Amino acid sequence: MEHELYFDCTLTEYSWSIKTENKIVNQIREHPPAYLSGGKLDIKEEQQSKCIAIHVGIYWGLGVFIIKDHDVVNVMCDSEEIRDLMTQNRKVDDQIINDKIYFINQLTSHRNLKINYKVIKSESNLATELLSTNDKKSASRNSRGFV
């Protein structure tokens, strides 16, 4: 099966939308305080947050059985910069980003996923609206109802 993963973020929260055929599932989460990760996830830059959103979106999609082994996941990037970061397979001077890329690649390998990174226009990003609405329109902050 083929899925589209949209994601967006701020320094305090991140959202993702998984589109499969005609169904869209929206989720939003706050970044936990850095002390909960022993300081490892002290988010200071948007790129860090975007890498976390991609990782969590794929991981969550697998966990609630939307994404399954051998599926195709089209990760819809709203910048060439993040697409290049995810596809160039090189280390950067940021441990959070390196760790997230490693975990995404590990998930991809273990679950035999085909990941394609595609650049889209920002206004086409389904996950952006989730961050910009005060009532968190149609986005769940937990996984109840999915598992």
Residue ranges and their predicted role:
Residues 5-6, 64, 116, 145:
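Intrinsic disorder/low-structure terminal segments
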Residues 33-34, 101-105, 145-147:
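Short, surface-exposed, polar/charged, turn-prone segments marking secondary-structure boundaries
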Residues 137-146:
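Positively charged N-terminal leader segments that act as targeting/secretion signals
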Residues 22-25, 112, 144:
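Low-complexity, intrinsically disordered short peptide segments enriched in small/polar/basic residues
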Residues 55-133:
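RNase H catalytic domain
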Residues 28-75:
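Acidic helix/loop or adjacent segment enriched in Glu/Asp that either coordinates divalent metal
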Residues 1-48:
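RNase H-like nuclease fold core
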